[in-house]
Amino acid sequence: MEFNWSEIALNTAKELEEKIMPLFGTKKAGENVGTNVSGDVTKYVDKVAEDIILKRLVPLGVNVVSEEVGTVDSGSDYTVVVDPLDGSYNFSAGIPIFAFSLGIFKGKKPVYGAIYEFLPENFYEAKPGKGAYLNGERIRVNEPEPGKEALSFYTRGRCLGLVKKVKRVRVLGAIAVELAYVARGSLDGVFDIRNYVRPTDVAAGVLLVREAGGIVTDERGREFEVKLSATEKTNIIAVANERLLNTILEAMKDEP
């Protein structure tokens, strides 16, 4: 069976938007209602969003990997790796940086990725070999001058010397959004070395960055592979070009 993933992704995003946006910035959104399969706290808005996702995707007969419930194995060739709401803390706190992320795999190979940024309703999508798009328009990574890069950098004390080698450092609190920003050239890189990144966070964004001309690796510079798991945690480097990748890898070698 073939699927129109673009239509499925956008329709799902629009239903999520309709159901969860009334909760934006409310105390109700941030209420703790349990723990997910990784042992992290599940917020009320996460539960609402995931219920919508499962209602839409499970009847398609595909496998689903989601942050809260874990893996729903339907025995399909297709696996949907999804984060219904990346940036749920931002959402609950009234910070307008959060997104729906959906990556499609046939076997272990990515075949489609979409990120829907609820505010301001930006729809990013990519297919292998077909490029990356924002609201239907082709996007490409930026080509920053050396030393003038803008980088999103997540750390717990490691590699702090990197801050001196780039011009701007940002931490937006929603890595799906940040990967989309790298793909469209608004950021030059995202670097997270907290051993905290889940496949559900980045399944769509990794494809988006690569199709926009960027590079995505692990912390050793090896090609980043999205695992079809809800519990795996890892590190990631996503950058606009090889020069910035080398700057980051050298900074990691220099750390005490």
Swiss-Prot record:
Its EC number is 3.1.3.11, 3.1.3.25. InterPro entries: Inositol_monoP_metal-BS, Inositol_monophosphatase-like. Mg(2+) 2 binds at residues 83, 86, 201. Induction: Constitutively expressed, at a very weak level. Keywords: Carbohydrate metabolism, Hydrolase, Magnesium, Metal-binding. It catalyses: beta-D-fructose 1,6-bisphosphate + H2O = beta-D-fructose 6-phosphate + phosphate; a myo-inositol phosphate + H2O = myo-inositol + phosphate. Its cofactor is Mg(2+). GO terms for biological process: inositol metabolic process; signal transduction. Substrate binds at residues 86-88, 170, 175, 194. It comes from the Archaea. GO terms for molecular function: fructose 1,6-bisphosphate 1-phosphatase activity; inositol monophosphate 1-phosphatase activity; metal ion binding. Disruption phenotype: Disruption of this gene does not lead to any detectable phenotypic changes regarding the growth under gluconeogenic conditions (medium supplemented with pyruvate) and glycolytic conditions (medium supplemented with soluble starch). The keyword Ribosomal protein does not apply. Pfam families: Inositol_P (PF00459). It is an enzyme of class 3 (hydrolase). Mg(2+) 1 binds at residues 67, 83, 85. PANTHER family: INOSITOL MONOPHOSPHATASE, INOSITOL-1-MONOPHOSPHATASE-RELATED. Is not able to complement the defect of the fbp deletion under gluconeogenic conditions, probably due to insufficient transcription. Homodimer. Belongs to the inositol monophosphatase superfamily. FBPase class 4 family. Phosphatase with broad specificity; it can dephosphorylate fructose 1,6-bisphosphate (FBP) and inositol-1-phosphate (IMP). However, while possessing a high FBPase activity in vitro, does not participate in gluconeogenesis in vivo. NCBIfam families: PRK12676.1 (NF009321). This is Fructose-1,6-bisphosphatase/inositol-1-monophosphatase. It comes from Thermococcus kodakarensis (strain ATCC BAA-918 / JCM 12380 / KOD1) (Pyrococcus kodakaraensis (strain KOD1)). The gene is suhB.
